[in-house]
Amino acid sequence: MSVPWFNQFYKEIADSPLSAWLELLPGQISTWQKEQLHGDFNKWVKLLGKLPQTHPSEIELKERVEFGLQSEINEYTQKQIIGLLKQFMPWRKGPFHIHGIHIDTEWRSDWKWERVQPHIQSLENRYVLDVGCGSGYHMWRMLGENAKMVVGADPSQLFLMQFQATKHFNPDPRIHLLPVGVEQLPEKNAFDTVFSMGVLYHRKSPLDFLQQLKNQLRPGGELILETLVVEGDENTVLMAGDRYAQMRNVWFLPSTDALCLWMKRLGFKNVRVVDLAKTTIEEQRATQWMDSQSLVDFLDPNDHSKTIEGYPAPLRAVVVAER
């Protein structure tokens, strides 16, 4: 089943710094649509098509992500929207407010944004890339800072569907999600700002990943990196065994000093740690929109300073640097 989302993106970038992407990206997306679709993809697209057309009178992106008022839809339509959106569970990153419907996601991603946003350069009129964007919560907040265009990259097709479900209620032409990894993006030094939050520790080759992020930035552009870290000096890096906090796909957890050293070795400038925060069970928890296990189940029940495997509990750093 072909979808129109990407053709709209190609039109938007034709006269932009991203125009060189048109040499490769349409072919990659076409191959993806032919060969790599999730088994539920067509079902999900049909569900998206059932979302009712509404006319939100108010769009709020600066303080939260909210599309429309409860008073603009009737009770039947509200139940219809809830029923359809719940077909895309689990909802991990948010929260979203759609015509009075509170999508209470596993993560309070708004808390992370509050830790990040004060420390970054203005996004006004900037081309912004969010690598590992999930369902796009932070992309909407970036748009709320008046970015010229926000592009997200995340290979998860469920996240793509969640993004398209929210975009249904605010079809803004300045925001797009591509179902690809950063390694598939053409390296054209086109972005003013690149974000990558919650991805580095999932990569087997973290320095290669940092280099890929750098290759998306224009000279002088800003990188905002948020990742799990451990305490220690510049020689401290934790590699967990089979799992870390029940996650299988976790590789390197450096200290902040080690991470800054990696970035300096790769040629990043003005590298600095701007925030350090322990993840709490209030920030990541099970909800009606993500009703399976969450952080409290992944920590030592007798000592929340440790994971269930005995490693240091999640500690997240925000590092900012320029190309």
Swiss-Prot record:
Gene3D superfamilies: Vaccinia Virus protein VP39. The keyword Hydrolase does not apply. Pfam families: Methyltransf_9 (PF08003). It is an enzyme of class 2 (transferase). Transmembrane segments: none annotated. Its EC number is 2.5.1.-. Carboxy-S-adenosyl-L-methionine binds at residues 93, 107, 112, 132, 154-156, 182-183, 197, 201, 316. One of its GO terms (molecular function) is transferase activity, transferring alkyl or aryl (other than methyl) groups. One of its GO terms (biological process) is tRNA wobble uridine modification. It catalyses: carboxy-S-adenosyl-L-methionine + 5-hydroxyuridine(34) in tRNA = 5-carboxymethoxyuridine(34) in tRNA + S-adenosyl-L-homocysteine + H(+). Keywords: Transferase, tRNA processing. Catalyzes carboxymethyl transfer from carboxy-S-adenosyl-L-methionine (Cx-SAM) to 5-hydroxyuridine (ho5U) to form 5-carboxymethoxyuridine (cmo5U) at position 34 in tRNAs. Belongs to the class I-like SAM-binding methyltransferase superfamily. CmoB family. Homotetramer. HAMAP family: tRNA_carboxymethyltr_CmoB (MF_01590). NCBIfam families: PRK15068.1, tRNA 5-methoxyuridine(34)/uridine 5-oxyacetic acid(34) synthase CmoB. This is tRNA U34 carboxymethyltransferase.
